[in-house]
Amino acid sequence: GEIMTYYNKCNLPLEALPEWITWLKDPLELSGVGISTFNLPAGKGYTYMHSHEEQEEIYIILSGIGVIMLKDELVDLTAGDFVRVSPPVRRALKADNEVSMAGIIVGGVAKVGYSRYKGSSSLIDDGIPDWENLPPWCEGNEKIVEINKKLKAQREAIKTAG
């Protein structure tokens, strides 16, 4: 496959996201995670229900209020809510009749074998810490060196435990 640049960046005004859905696949050249933003005008919502073959989705509500229809259940949404939806569940979003609703949708496909370690706090526990090369804002800070020693020991204990 194609070699991607080592990072991609785009900027959207979080306080005034573009209306409806903004897909970030192309601007960010995504290959392993789906992400989009939504800004539904008051009283408006998806025009159809949808589900997925494999993709798990997380809806993150940044502002406003509304509902998400999950199967036959209406779930109220407000700023600060995070909702995970299993792939086969039919879903659709709608903003409140008086207030718009904006947020972020993140999607991913389960990969067999993750989390690899029972004690992991992250799902995709494939991080490779470089304990020797600190970011410039931490250089020379002995407290950070001590914190990192503890973190390294915790990570090694989790890996050893399986």
Protein language model annotation of sequence segments:
Residues 19-23, 36-52:
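Conserved short histidine dyad/triad with adjacent acidic residue
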Residues 54-56, 60-66:
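Glycine- and acidic-residue-biased ligand/ion/polar-headgroup-sensing regions
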Residues 29, 67, 87-114:
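Ligand-binding loop in jelly-roll beta-barrel domains
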Residues 32, 53-54:
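Short, small/polar residue-rich loop motifs at catalytic or cofactor-binding pockets
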Residues 1-33, 118-162:
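A short, N-terminal "cap"/entry segment at the start of jelly-roll beta-barrel domains
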Residues 72-88:
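Short acidic-glycine-tyrosine-enriched beta hairpin
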Residues 31, 69-73:
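Short strand-coil-strand connectors
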